[in-house]
């Protein structure tokens, strides 16, 4: 899809979708507890892939298509192994199959996809989570099903640590106990998943785009007090529900990024909150004369795109000052962005970055790959139009 996006001042209230990070985990845990889960209206593509894959647990020799969903693939590989579904073949987009998966799982790449060569074993797993924590989450959900106990030993500090915390808290919600140890986790075997109410939370990584737009619009208003754009956040069903981007669950409203937006620090470490790179980079790009260094970005090169490079390319094309290094981005704010032609790099979060940047630019932006938002936020363009964003489809 090729879109032409025109500078627009957004007005109104937008409701963000539910957290797909939390819903992935709930779909799996509820399935293991014998529960069914109704998907939300217009579910993200990643959620549809996980739901469809779980349905294939009941059929012989399934081909499990994961699309571009790293969560679906890395969460479910250990689960299928634990349940003895060794006749399954996992496949997905070419980019997904290039993303890191530990050799310890014993997968066999074939022309058809990834095949499982052995059941999941209990015992000690020594893993690195420096590139992704998703396989660790997958093991945390699968190992309790085995008869014997297991330990996970992490060889270095994991990235996206709050997502591991989310996994543990969802497991606890379903009666599965995982003990954190100094070097990783201890998991008792022979555990049973317990039915429990569905946990929900807003997708803060999606909300961050609108919150940045609202703040920049407010900054551009005389006096800096008028705010025409508001973000409505769905209430959680449990007080201690973890939030999707890994911040403290007690935060409310726009306080998820308030700390950044109030006074952008010189250095922002994104190791634990990687999905905030795109919206915060846009915000930093529009703070004239201020330089912000985003660190902990190296592992983002193995996401749906090489995200640090994609962010740098999109913002540079639109007039921002960006310096790219192996593990960091350095952005010096400018007074405004201009129009241009950019690409989503096949990445939903880059497409949303480009869309928001276009609203704040001084000329139209042509975006190739606008359909990528369906991966996490299918209604993104619809919501933008409802808020007054002018969009034109040049090529479906």
Model regions and ranges:
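Structural preference for solvent-exposed beta-strand-turn elements
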Residues: 1-396
């Amino acid at each position: 899809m090729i879109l032409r996006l025109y500078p627009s001042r957004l007005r109104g209230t937008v409701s963000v979708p539910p957290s797909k990070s939390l819903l992935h985990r709930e779909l799996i845990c509820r399935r293991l507890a014998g529960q069914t889960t109704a998907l939300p209206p217009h579910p993200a593509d990643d959620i549809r892939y996980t739901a469809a894959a779980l349905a294939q647990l009941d059929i012989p020799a399934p081909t499990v298509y994961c699309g571009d969903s790293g969560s679906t693939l890395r969460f479910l590989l250990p689960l299928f192994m634990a349940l003895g579904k060794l006749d399954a073949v996992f496949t997905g987009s070419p980019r997904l199959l290039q993303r890191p998966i530990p050799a310890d799982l014993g997968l066999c790449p074939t022309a058809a996809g990834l095949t499982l060569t052995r059941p999941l074993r209990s015992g000690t797993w020594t893993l690195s989570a420096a590139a992704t924590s998703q396989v660790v989450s997958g093991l945390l959900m699968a190992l309790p099903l085995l008869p014997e106990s297991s330990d996970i030993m992490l060889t270095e500090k994991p990235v996206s640590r709050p997502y591991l915390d989310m996994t543990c808290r969802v497991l606890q919600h379903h009666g599965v106990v995982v003990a954190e140890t100094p070097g990783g986790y201890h998991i008792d075997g022979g555990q049973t998943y317990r039915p429990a109410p569905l946990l929900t939370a807003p997708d803060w990584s999606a909300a961050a785009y609108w919150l940045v737009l609202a703040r920049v619009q407010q900054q551009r208003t005389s006096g800096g007090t008028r705010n025409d754009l508001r973000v409505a956040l769905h209430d959680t069903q449990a007080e201690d529900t973890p939030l999707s981007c890994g911040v403290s669950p007690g935060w409310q409203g726009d306080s998820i990024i308030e700390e950044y937006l109030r006074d952008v620090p010189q250095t922002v470490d994104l190791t634990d909150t990687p999905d905030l790179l795109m919206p915060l980079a846009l915000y930093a790009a529009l703070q004239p004369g201020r330089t912000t260094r985003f660190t902990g970005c190296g592992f983002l090169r193995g996401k749906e795109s090489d995200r640090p490079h994609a962010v740098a390319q999109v913002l540079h094309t639109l007039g921002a000052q960006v310096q790219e290094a192996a593990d960091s981005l350095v952005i010096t704010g400018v007074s405004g962005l201009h129009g241009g032609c950019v690409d989503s790099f096949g990445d939903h979060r880059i497409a949303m970055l480009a869309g928001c940047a276009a609203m704040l630019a001084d000329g139209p932006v042509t975006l190739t790959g606008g359909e990528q938002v369906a991966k996490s936020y299918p209604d993104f363009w619809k919501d933008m139009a409802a808020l007054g964003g002018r969009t034109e489809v040049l090529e479906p």
